[in-house]
């Protein structure tokens, strides 16, 4: 299965509906957010291991959550448990140059992995994402 086939299946199943969200899903390739050992499975509609007992969420689940969130350009969003950064990058694409996503991940090595993945799209350099390691249970006081 290809990236476009995965996205089209999620659209066909009714989980992706909003044009700006669909556009972001099409631009942000899940394959860039999975460990090397799982690149071949990146387009399977299933969670995949990303290390440390964690997974990258099932694409259908991410689509469902983002559709419910209804993010808009210019929004400020906190992504708690950002993991490999896939959802963070999708949200950064949606909020655009006037928005910001604060991503927080408890596990240090995953935070490093997620930050590196998000950086592939220059979202950190562009100021759309701030990716930090820490406990997100209290949010990011003063930021999100």
Regions found by a protein language model. Name each.
Residues 70-144:
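Conserved nucleotide-cofactor-binding alpha/beta core module
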Residues 19-20, 60, 109:
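Cytosolic histidine kinase catalytic core of two-component systems
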Residues 7-8, 42-45, 56-75:
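Conserved alpha-helix/loop element of class I SAM-dependent methyltransferases that forms part
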């Amino acid at each position: 299965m290809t990236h476009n086939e995965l996205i089209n299946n999620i659209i066909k199943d009714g989980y992706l509906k909003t044009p700006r969200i669909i556009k972001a899903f099409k631009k942000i390739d899940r394959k860039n957010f999975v460990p090397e050992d799982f690149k071949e499975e990146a387009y399977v509609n299933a969670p995949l291991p990303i290390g440390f007992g964690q997974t990258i969420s099932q694409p259908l689940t991410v689509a469902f959550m983002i559709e419910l969130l209804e993010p808009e350009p210019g929004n400020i969003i906190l992504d708690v448990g950002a993991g490999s950064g896939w959802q963070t990058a999708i949200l950064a694409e949606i909020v655009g140059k006037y928005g910001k996503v604060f991503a927080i991940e408890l596990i240090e090595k995953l935070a490093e992995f997620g930050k590196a993945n998000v950086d592939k799209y220059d979202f950190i350099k562009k100021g759309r994402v701030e990716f930090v390691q820490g406990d997100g249970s209290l949010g990011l006081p003063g930021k999100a």
